[in-house]
């Protein structure tokens, strides 16, 4: 009898469990789970409560990631808790994860369609993303639920704020659209030669209106692109690049990534800046999102090849191997384009519309000449300037140095090169000006520049009194043999026995006494006159180290000054007697 009743009792027990929605462990089970092929969804409110407590503690201490993990566990323990979805959504928003937050709001509203706060939060997220239509619809549903609850006339301040912001965004976008049409019309007319320069006030208004929209809706892609365009019209290319960078984060664009790469690498970058690295990173991002993109792959190969040559040149430059620098910059093959030529061609190509594109990579609204403004070319021109100067080939150095100074008037290397040329031309005023400028730019701490400045100052002083080279009619760069030949000729012509004056002969002998001695000539070329008893004693003239800074420098300068030169010198000016024959 008992054995017969047992199966019936088990069947009855199972029926009751199904009816009550209980599992064998006493945990609530959704009854409809048994009606489907899916495994039953078990709910454990006690465990869920524990995870919620952990999540709330994490939220209060700003540990949003820990809070999210706890919310995930809470929802696993109790998937029917719509309030937990709401809390997790707010944590997602704190981390900027708007898409995940919107999904949580959707899950919440399936469980509790009348939870008005979820619609308000949805409206805020949609507005931030610039989706005005969805924001408006969410607000409409929010107002409808509030009306059902009898609270239509007591709208919270938060809801009113969303409404006013939505109105401002819609109005600004409409005005911006009209303004863009006017700018388009003016630009097209300008290309045909029928209009003057674009109205600057309208361009400013474009930037202002777009800025107002983006304060509220930073993810509004179209407005960000419009502002970037107006920034280029204003000549603010780096501000435009910031907007394009944000745009490719919102929606990957191979074209914009190539544009950013060209501008970052070739135009706005400076030596050692992050822009150079960004130039390659933009192309890597393009190939990551679109591995088969031929345009990005081609540009990536080109820049990698350039970087290989540039790395060589930079290494030689830093090790002061200047002939090797020039060799590295000649390019990979003899007779082919140089590295500078390759860079100029890359920039020029970027100003033209390429196959498959609708506009050039460097916008037609770009103000100025991107070749002249290229930061990469500035670096290479500086290398050429320095290398040729160090190799004492000023004729080749100066064209590059002038290009550097045109873009960067305070460039130390180019200023030093110009000073060196001035010294060679015996234009000591210019040399002193340039060396003073370079010394100031170095923070007045570069001893090599300071030494050159002192030499130029001494030469300037000597040129205003005695110029032995001029006396003999020779150049500072002439050889000893040439100087000796000139001396003999002048001595014959000006000897008192031949009708010359004693004074003129004394000047010739004095000049030869210095220039005919290699050691004395070197001293004179450094700005010290061996025949001047006070030679070298310039006190603090142009010397920041003369007082207080480096006392030993002053001591050595004084030692060099007394006596004029080793061995006592010729304090009164030595008289040489020339014998004919």
UniProtKB/Swiss-Prot annotation:
The keyword Glycoprotein applies. It comes from the Eukaryota. One of its GO terms (molecular function) is protein-folding chaperone binding. Induction: Expression is induced by the unfolded protein response (UPR) and controlled by the UPR-specific transcription factor CIP1. TPR repeats lie at residues 48-81, 82-115, 116-149, 221-254, 257-293, 378-411, 412-445. It is found in: Endoplasmic reticulum lumen. Pfam families: DnaJ (PF00226), TPR_16 (PF13432), TPR_6 (PF13174). Glycans are attached at residue 293. GO terms for biological process: protein folding in endoplasmic reticulum. Disruption phenotype: Leads to hypersensitivity to endoplasmic reticulum (ER) stress caused by the N-glycosylation inhibitor tunicamycin, but only to slight reduction of virulence. Severely affects growth and displays an altered morphology, when the calnexin CNE1 is also deleted. Keywords: Chaperone, Endoplasmic reticulum, Glycoprotein, Repeat, Signal, TPR repeat, Virulence. Residues 1-19 form the signal peptide. Residues 467-528 form the J domain. The keyword Endoplasmic reticulum applies. Residues 522-544 are annotated as: Disordered. Its main location: endoplasmic reticulum. GO terms for cellular component: endoplasmic reticulum; endoplasmic reticulum lumen. Endoplasmic reticulum (ER) protein that functions as a co-chaperone for BIP1 during ER stress. Might be specifically involved in the refolding of N-glycosylated proteins. The TPR repeats mediate interaction with unfolded polypeptides and the J-domain is essential to stimulate the ATPase activity of the chaperone and to increase its substrate affinity during the folding cycle. Interacts with the ER chaperone BIP1. This is Tetratricopeptide repeat and J domain-containing co-chaperone DNJ1. It comes from Mycosarcoma maydis.
């Amino acid at each position: 009898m008992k054995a017969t009743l047992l199966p019936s009792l088990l069947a009855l027990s199972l029926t009751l469990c199904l009816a009550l929605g209980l599992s064998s462990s006493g945990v609530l089970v959704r009854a409809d789970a048994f009606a489907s092929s899916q495994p039953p969804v078990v709910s454990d409110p006690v465990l869920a409560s524990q995870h919620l407590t952990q999540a709330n503690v994490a939220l209060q201490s700003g540990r949003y990631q820990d809070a999210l993990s706890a919310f995930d566990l809470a929802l696993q323990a109790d998937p029917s808790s719509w309030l937990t979805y709401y809390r997790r959504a707010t944590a997602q928003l704190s981390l900027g994860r708007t898409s995940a937050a919107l999904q949580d709001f959707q899950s919440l509203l399936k469980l509790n369609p009348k939870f008005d706060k979820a619609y308000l939060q949805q409206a805020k997220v949609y507005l931030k993303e610039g989706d005005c239509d969805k924001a408006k619809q969410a607000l409409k549903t929010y107002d409808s639920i509030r009306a059902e609850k009898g609270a239509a006339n007591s709208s919270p301040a938060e809801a009113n704020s969303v409404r006013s912001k939505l109105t401002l965004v819609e109005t600004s976008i409409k005005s911006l659209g009209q303004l863009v049409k006017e700018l388009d019309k003016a630009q097209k007319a300008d290309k045909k030669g029928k209009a003057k320069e674009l109205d600057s006030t309208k361009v400013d208004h474009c930037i202002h209106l777009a800025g107002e929209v983006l304060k509220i809706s930073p993810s509004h892609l179209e407005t960000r692109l419009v502002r970037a365009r107006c920034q280029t019209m204003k000549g603010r290319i780096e501000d435009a690049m910031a907007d394009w960078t944000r745009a490719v984060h919102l929606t990957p664009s191979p074209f914009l990534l190539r544009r950013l790469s060209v501008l970052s690498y070739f135009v706005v970058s400076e030596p050692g800046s992050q822009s150079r690295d960004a130039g390659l990173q933009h192309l890597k991002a393009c190939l990551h999102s679109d591995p088969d993109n031929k345009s990005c792959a081609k540009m990536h190969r080109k820049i990698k090849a350039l970087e290989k040559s540039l790395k060589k040149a930079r290494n030689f430059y830093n090790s002061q191997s200047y002939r090797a620098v020039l060799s590295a910059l000649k390019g990979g093959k003899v007779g082919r384009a140089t590295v500078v030529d390759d860079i100029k061609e890359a920039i020029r190509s970027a100003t033209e519309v390429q196959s498959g594109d609708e506009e050039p990579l460097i916008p037609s609204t770009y103000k100025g000449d991107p070749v002249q403004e290229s930061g990469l070319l500035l670096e290479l021109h500086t290398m050429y300037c320095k290398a040729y100067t160090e190799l004492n080939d000023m004729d080749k150095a100066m064209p590059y140095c002038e290009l550097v100074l045109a873009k960067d008037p305070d460039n130390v290397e180019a200023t030093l090169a110009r000073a060196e040329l001035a010294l060679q031309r015996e234009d000591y005023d210019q040399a002193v000006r340039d060396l003073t400028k370079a010394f100031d730019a170095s923070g007045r701490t570069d001893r090599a520049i300071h030494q050159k400045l002192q030499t130029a100052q001494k030469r300037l002083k000597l040129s205003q009194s005695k110029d032995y080279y001029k006396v003999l009619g020779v150049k500072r760069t002439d050889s000893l043999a040439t100087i000796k030949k000139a001396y003999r000729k002048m001595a014959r012509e000006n000897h008192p026995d031949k009708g010359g004056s004693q004074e003129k002969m004394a000047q010739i002998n004095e000049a030869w006494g210095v220039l005919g001695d290699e050691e004395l000539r070197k001293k004179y070329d450094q700005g010290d006159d061996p025949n001047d008893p006070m030679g070298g004693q310039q006190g603090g003239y142009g010397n920041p180290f003369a007082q207080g800074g480096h006392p030993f420098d002053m001591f050595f300068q004084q030692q060099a000054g007394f006596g004029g030169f080793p061995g006592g010198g010729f304090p009164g000016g030595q008289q040489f007697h020339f014998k004919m024959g």
